[in-house]
Amino acid sequence: MMCALPGTGKDTWIRSNLPDVPMVSLDAIRAELGVSWEDGQGPVVARAFERAREHLRAHRSFVWNATCLTPDLRKRELQLFRDYGAYTEIVVLEVPWEEGLRRNRNRKAVVPEDVIDAMLGRFTPPSVREAHEVLSVV
């Protein structure tokens, strides 16, 4: 599971470090469904959970690629992983503020700076109690 603000390089980190591991990406599902991050996320999350269950049933490793910035936002997904007996690792990515904003401006789906700032205000780093392993990449 990834844990990071928009623009920190989650996709890039996954491509560089886990190139052969399937990914369940909320951004990719939004694009498939034609849903903006500003719209209701119910169908996006439902599709993501369907895909996660497919991987879990097949005992196949995968990456959950979303911001996952608070314990509440991680809880449901991590419970699903535990229900299937999966080994869970949370990768926390952090970059300097200005670098993250620059990267965000170069994304296809730009998130407004005030929204990212609010997300940062709610960010709660994961506890080692939430997963088998927590990796922090700065």
What are these regions (language model features)?
Residues 2-3, 8-11, 16, 20-22, ...:
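Conserved GTP-binding G-domain of TRAFAC-class P-loop NTPases and closely related GTPase folds
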Residues 8-62, 69-72, 97-102:
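Conserved substrate/cofactor phosphate-moiety recognition/catalytic segment
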Residues 23-26, 85-87, 112:
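Short hydrophobic/aromatic-enriched beta-strand-loop microsegments
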Residues 32, 56, 69-109, 118-127:
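ATP-dependent NMP and nucleoside kinases share a basic, alpha-helical "lid"
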Residues 41-45, 82-83, 109-112:
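Short, low-complexity, polar/charged sequence segments that are solvent-exposed and flexible
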Residues 44, 83-84, 130-135:
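Short, charged low-complexity intrinsically disordered segments located at boundaries
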